[in-house]
Amino acid sequence: MKRIGIAINPSKDNENKIVQMVKDKFNEKFDLEEIIVFNSYETKNLILHKPLDLIVVLGGDGTLLNVAREISKKAYEVPIFGINIGNLGFLSSIDISEIDKALNKLKNQEYSLEKRMLLNCIQENKEPVIALNDVVVARGTLSRMVKFEIFID
C-alpha cells in the first residue's frame, strides 16, 4: 500500500485531531508515498491523477454512504475502509477505538474485501441516483397512486 485517501466529515473533527492521529498511525505502520486528505462533502470534486490503494472514511454511516456513492460515480475502483467517529456506524469497518488492532490486521493482510452492489434509482425526468445501502421512496405532498417498475439483472 503506497497511496491512500482519507475522507473526513469535518463536523465530526473540526480541529483535525482525529485525522492527524489517523495519518500518524498509517505512516507508522506503512511506507506510504502519499496521503490525500479531503473533505467528505467535497468527494464529488475529487480528481485523482494516480489511483489510490485505499480510501479511509472518517465519520458515520452517512459519510460512508456519501463517499461510496461519489467514488462509484467516478468509476474509481478502490477499497473503502470506514472508521466510525459518528453517531451511527453500522456500515463502518471499525470504531476509532479499534484503529491499532485494525491497522495491524491490514498490515498483515488479515482481512477480506467485500464487493457491494449498488442500486441505480431512475425517476422520470430526474437525474439517476446511485445508492449503496438503500433507496427510500416516499410520497410527496399530494396523495395519489404510485406506479413502480423494479428490475434486477
What are these regions (language model features)?
Residues 63-68:
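Short glycine/serine/threonine-rich phosphate/pyrophosphate-binding segments
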Residues 76-92:
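Short, acidic/small-residue loops that bind anionic groups at enzyme active sites
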Residues 1-54, 58, 96-112, 123-129:
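ATP/NTP phosphate-donor binding region
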Residues 31, 76, 117:
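Residue-level signal for beta-strand positions within conserved beta-sheet cores that form or flank
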Residues 88-153:
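Catalytic core of DAGKc-family lipid kinases
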Residues 26, 71-75:
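Active-site catalytic pocket residues across diverse enzymes, especially alpha/beta-hydrolases
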